[in-house]
């Protein structure tokens, strides 16, 4: 199977990935190639870090309604929301369809795709954007996420959790990421096996249609919930969420500090926050 390793390294090199693997870094079965049971998932980590590098700190904006902003500012709590709230927006689906992840797309007896109950229920996230925005982007965010009397929070994020990453956007509908596509195609065609990327169920959440969402240039903080381990979700009616206390490193691995508040009129908030009036 040294030829298989050589082919994998050849694909990595051609796609710009510097790392190389050896035979001991992967597990080869009759049907699959993976590093799922390896203590150091060298191949999967190399691919993930190349396509979706982790971000340890960033200054970002979060656009939201006045009501939500006042809740955050006065309670000192920021929420990660359940990704199932965006079931109809192409979350996870876009990645699975484009990259032919049939297992997640299979439907149950109720007609629901498997990803809806295998991935969505325990995936929580928050969306942010870059502070260097064009005039067009600024208008888009105010209009779509903070219309009328909405608020923009400038936030300093420090992440111990590796799942603070930038989104990848599909520039051509149905065209997969070349690195993943080339690797999968090579292993399937030459060795009649399927390549399994460790963490794929998590990475599905960092991919959306560029045509629909590319303007957002989104940073995403993600947290996966596991029963009996770490923070557990709370509910507010039909919605579930994870609470992040501001100004300290949370159990989820994120520290959020609000440095400025921008709006047309100052929201109700503690005097310790810096307010900047937004222009018309």
Language-model segments: residues:
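Partner-binding and oligomerization surfaces adjacent to conserved cores of proteins
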Residues: 1-280
